Regions:
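C-terminal accessory/regulatory regions appended to core domains
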Residues: 1-92
């Protein structure tokens, strides 16, 4: 399960304004017209996907419930995903 909050670089309790600001910053950073990196297009799509989900209150609520349930049902896999996301952020 993707951590869309990590994709945008915000906390789970981020306001709508913080989400929008993070989305604009990341979209600008990874837009294929502005970033020649081979993985920029993929990161741009992930950023769009994360914002589309988190900007819709119903989808965001469902996502938060799935995150909570995932942590309770499979803590090792969730911890590994969190650690992987953290390490990827460090090397960027």
């Amino acid at each position: 399960m993707k951590d869309y909050y990590a994709v945008l670089g915000v906390e789970a309790d981020a306001s709508d304004g913080a989400l929008k600001s993070a989305y604009r910053r990341r979209a600008s950073e990874f837009h294929p017209d502005r970033n020649p990196s081979p993985d920029a297009a993929q990161k741009f799509r992930e950023t769009q996907e994360a914002y589309d989900l988190l900007s819709d209150p119903a989808k965001r609520h469902d996502h938060d419930e799935n995150r909570r349930r995932s942590l309770l049902e499979n803590p090792l896999a969730t911890a590994q995903d969190i650690w992987k996301t953290y390490m990827n952020k460090l090397v960027q």
